[in-house]
Amino acid sequence: MRAALEQAGATVDEVTHINAHATSTPVGDIAEYKALLAVFGERVHDIPVSATKAATGHLLGGTGALEAIFTILAVKNRLAPPTINLTEKDPEIPLSVGGEAQPLGDAPQLAISNSFGFGGHNSVVAIRSYDS
């Protein structure tokens, strides 16, 4: 995440939305949360987070591309997509994950999309609004 932001010429303070990879597994989700906490600090609790894989299922190698499309649309429409089927939040992961779409406001947008694949393939893209 740090490398993606650095390559984008951005800082953690500019991020307005996170599309988490969110595997919905106890090990995977807590690991991603700890990574987010390490990068964003306590500010991560104020950033709207989506987990769009819940809407599509796991598409193996295609998952990251589709999650990036969700993130592009979130930035374009200034609206973080909902995390569907979320009925019970993990108390160990106190993120701002919504079951409803979350408005992102009128300010320039910068979102990241995490994709953590099988075998340790990890990628993150930073997507900035055109008005930035």
Residue ranges and their predicted role:
Residues M1-S132:
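Conserved "HGTGT" condensation-loop signature of ketosynthase/thiolase-family condensing enzymes
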